[in-house]
Every structure is written in C-alpha cells, then in structure tokens.
Amino acid sequence: MKAYTERVFGNHEGKDVLAYRFETDGGYQLEVMTYGATILRYVTPDKAGNFANVILGFDDFESYVGNSPKHGASVGPVAGRIAGATFELNGKTYDLEVNNASNCNHSGSTGWDASLFELVEVSDNGLTLYTERTDGTGGFPGNLKIWISYHLEETGAYEVSYKVTTDQDT
C-alpha cells in the first residue's frame, strides 16, 4: 500500500470537508470525503486492464450538497423508500420528510449523506468516520451514534462497515 493522502475538497458551514485517498501498489484507488462519508473515487481496471474511476459523482464539492441522487454517499438511517413518508413503531406514528411524490426516499434531506463526519482514525489502507444524529432528525426516533469504516485491500477489494448505536427503538 502507498501512503494515504489528504486534501481539502470543500467547505461546509465553515468547516473543511476533507478527502482521503488510499492506493494499492497495484494501482487501485479509493477516495472518501468526510461529507456524507461519501465515496468520491474507486479506480479499478476494466477487462483490458485499463484503470478508471467507476463511481458516479461530481468534480466539485458544491454539487454534493443537496445531492438528490446521493451519488457515492452513505445512506441512512433508512436506505430505500418509505411509502407515504410515515411509519409506526411501538404504537407511535412517525411522520417523515416527503421528498419523492408522497414518499420519503433514502431518509430525506437530513440523512447521513448530509452530515459532516469526523475522522476517528486513518491508516494507509482505510479510515473510520463518525457523526451523531439527535432524536427527531428527519422525523426518525432515537439519538444515533454512527461509525462508518472504509478499508481497501491490496487486491483492490474494498469493504464498508457500519456501526450504529441508539438510545431507543428506531
């Protein structure tokens, strides 16, 4: 593995948005930014052996803010569509943001993709990012603590792992 690199990719609400790039000796690359724990690049070879980025995304940070397609972003607390933008849990009804016809798609505009994560740890082959969500954010219950880790193997395979704790059912 080569040494990781860090760069400022943008600024969000007065804070630097950092991007971390990891590269194998064989040429595979993975780049992740702290805004939305978003994958910016994954460079891998095609069947002819030519390396190229296969992640759909944007060249500038500003295009990621309010990014409805959520290109490369970590999606949560719910990935997918919640019909009618409402759900019941433990006898209580929760109303969510409507952002797709009458539904809530990918947790709405306040999902993890809109959070600025903090760097917990970084090494030459990966990192762990962290953020918190307060009870009621986006209409969802529970105070959440969220860790997302990315790890690039020398073979080019990468792994994403999530750990979330909460103080109530969600």
Which ranges hold each PLM region?
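Surface-exposed acidic/polar loop and edge beta-strand patches at domain peripheries
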Residues: 1-170
